[in-house]
Amino acid sequence: MRKSHHGFTLIELVVVISIIGILAATALPRYINLQTQARVAKAQAIFGSIKSAAALARANCMVDLATSTAPTCTATAGATNMDGLNIAMANQYPTAADAGIIAAAQLNAGSDGVAITGTNPRLIAINGATTPASCSISYTEATAGPTAPLITLTTTGC
């Protein structure tokens, strides 16, 4: 009587392991690239949020200047109220401080996965980037009159 054998042969096992190795070698670079793309997308989203918040704060300041007999936002300093938050202003745009553009854009270092450093310019770096300073958004306050603040996006180190 012959016994039937159950299981895999050594050759079958080697072939399966080789196929899994080849698939892993092709999938790993794509996975790593997805993380980079995700950090770039996050930086672009925060960049857009900061630009929009600065424009909205300026519009709010302009309305305050035009309609109020005692405006809180003046041509050079002051504050404006956005969504119940008092936004610090300089030259009709948010300051680079926490009470300025950080509050206007409603950024939170902990929950947004960013590191917020510097004073003017203010640097918002994406956590987990290869070179955090090169995966960041920089906000420099407006220096005079209706000149917009300098907002730059750097994604070379994401």
What are these regions (language model features)?
Residues 38-65:
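Membrane-proximal N-terminal amphipathic helix
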